[in-house]
């Protein structure tokens, strides 16, 4: 049952959607006539922005609806398998910049998390925020204990009820869409909302972001290509994150990078190497690598170092996903479309009864024109996009982990080519993928497997004679038990056979006595019946053994 507050919010959402003419998204279909009639008969609201494109109207509507919808639009901008370019491009322009809330209020919430006055632990706290977004706000300070510059990231007050209310309405809408439009079920709208809810709630937990940052920092410890700021978990909590303050050039500021003498070619190639290292070596990748979260160090511009912030959203791939992904990319660039089709079936991404020949032909038809371009002009992200779009026609369900990966790959690829338009992603990535595959399935993989098990066998080897003796002894005892069970079983079978024999003789004698008695023979029937009863008793006794 919808509550009054939910109804009020739902009315606001519908009002904004109609004011921006978003009912134009509804297809011409008998099932959509009612929603279109509602605009005219119930709300009397006209499209107030007919001069703007549909994509721009969608972006403006989401901005007006607030932070939950802005972030949802940002996530949807990466789903180019669902939206055409003119929609996805507009969604990508959504900026997660909102009016800052009062610095004194931010300080109060920080002190609640810290358990005391902020001056106890920090000096030079600046009440003017360094940055403000829909989920959190950032202020600068220095640590009292050592004078290190830090930033304090605090969750916006009262943001959770707003998020929960809007997510609940999103679920209602997703269920309606799935019910009204059966063809939308393959897109799994309810699961898309569920994935978004998880992502959003993860971002509300500052300790989760701290843990992700610590993991990524450890993975690239002493790396010359990627730096992750230090987290100060002693001062952090669910609502507050304290981290090292960094100085760098925002990656989208091309002019500043050039002015600093940055080696743009190496910087772009490092971006690709960092991404594939995270995915294939670590199985743990930063999945929110938009320009606002990525900086470049001022130091050593000839060997530039990336700086990664905001690890609230990360992705992981299991061993099978990594292998199928690597094999797919290698098969693509060798134009082995049969292999691509077989990999999709083997992985379970498409149904097992898929016609391989038809699937191969569909992939070839879509992807062969792509490879007519020079390799340096081919987009990895768009190759995956075309593949997923084709596979959807063969009932491939959305794979959330692959969507997150595709989004990140598009970010990395876009950044790399923005920095250095001649970036050849294939030349950079191919050696990495081939080396990784050889280590997974080649002779080196066998050596690595033996090496990984060596400590275990080294520990167990001294115990081997004792384990062998115990095994033989237990085997002997087991054989004795089996022999005894077999003897008991055979004895039981013999007893049951003897019992059936006695019952048969007894029954025969009783029947004979009955026949004789009916013929007025008196002595013999009595003796026959007595013998029959005796045989029955013998049979009953045999059954009990």
Swiss-Prot record:
Binding-site residues for ATP, renumbered to this chain: 130-138, 153
InterPro entries, sorted: ABC1_dom, Kinase-like_dom_sf, UbiB, UbiB_bact, UbiB_kinase
Membrane-crossing residue ranges in chain numbering: 498-517, 521-540
Alphabetized Pfam families for the sequence: ABC1
Domain of life per record: Bacteria
Subcellular location: Cell inner membrane
Lineage, broadest ranks: Bacteria, Pseudomonadati, Pseudomonadota, Gammaproteobacteria, Vibrionales
Organism: Photobacterium profundum (strain SS9)
Any GO CC annotation of this UniProt entry: plasma membrane
Keyword Magnesium found: no
Name of the protein this chain belongs to: Probable protein kinase UbiB
Intrachain disulfide bonds: none
Principal localisation: membrane
This protein's pathway: Cofactor biosynthesis; ubiquinone biosynthesis [regulation]
